[in-house]
Regions:
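Serine/threonine-rich low-complexity intrinsically disordered regions
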Residues: 2-4, 48, 72, 99, ...
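Anionic-ligand anchoring segments at beta-strand to alpha-helix junctions in alpha/beta enzyme folds, i.e.
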Residues: 18-79
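A structured phosphate/pyrophosphate-recognition subdomain
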Residues: 2-20, 26, 38-44, 114-180
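Fold-independent oxyanion-binding glycine-rich loops
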Residues: 25, 57-58, 84-87, 106-109, ...
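Structural motif
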Residues: 19-21, 51-53, 80-81, 101-104, ...
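Short, surface-exposed, charge-dense and proline/glycine-enriched linear segments
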Residues: 3, 50-58, 80-92, 172-180
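General alpha-helical segment detector with a strong preference for membrane-spanning helices
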Residues: 33-35, 89, 111, 162
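Active-site cofactor/cluster-binding pocket
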Residues: 64-118
Length: 180
């Protein structure tokens, strides 16, 4: 699947739901949390009437990244579930009791067992934050200062300050655009 096409599919999927729950893996690292909070805040800035929640357990040492949400799942009407930075269902944090209609997945880990209606997995990317940044740069989703800061932190953290082998020219180009 061509990358430009996946951006359109993801944007269309986000646009078509009024309620969205964004989850990531248990025991989150900066890439998981920052991609989750960055995407949530971007969707909220772009579509202020949508109900968008970032869920899962809080981590005290990462509190400065932003606050997570605690929605009443019973009041939600089959929201879209977006899973970030998690390859399998049993590692998704914060979705117990959630009745969702579809799953949209963005991840840089190899595919495992999550059944999705839209899935973008690219193991050549440095981080899920890099992928979310590329999505935002190629759609009408807004990048606020806080969104850019979180996505930058996630990229720097998961690439171990640009030292891992999956750090590429596109990693630097994407990160540069966050700094502009």
């Amino acid at each position: 699947m061509m990358v430009k096409n996946i951006y359109k599919q993801i944007f269309k999927g986000i646009k078509s739901y009024d309620e969205i729950v964004i989850a990531r893996h248990i025991g989150p690292d900066p890439d998981a949390l920052c991609s989750q909070l960055g995407l949530r805040d971007s969707i909220r800035a772009t579509f202020p009437d949508k109900k968008v929640y970032a869920v899962g357990a809080s981590v005290a040492k990462f509190k400065s990244f932003g606050n997570l949400d605690h929605p009443n799942y019973e009041s939600l009407n089959n929201p879209l579930l977006i899973v970030l930075d998690v390859p399998n269902m049993h590692r998704i944090d914060g979705i117990d009791g959630l009745n969702y209609s579809n799953i949209l997945k963005i991840d840089h880990h190899p595919k495992e067992d999550i059944k999705c209606y839209i899935e973008w997995v690219d193991t050549d990317k440095s981080s899920t934050c890099q992928m979310v940044t590329e999505l935002l740069l190629n759609t009408k989703l807004k990048i606020t200062r806080k969104v850019a800061e979180n996505l930058f932190l996630g990229i720097v953290s998961d690439s171990e300050r640009f030292s891992l082998k999956n750090t590429s020219i596109s990693t630097f180009e994407t990160t540069k655009k966050l700094l502009e």
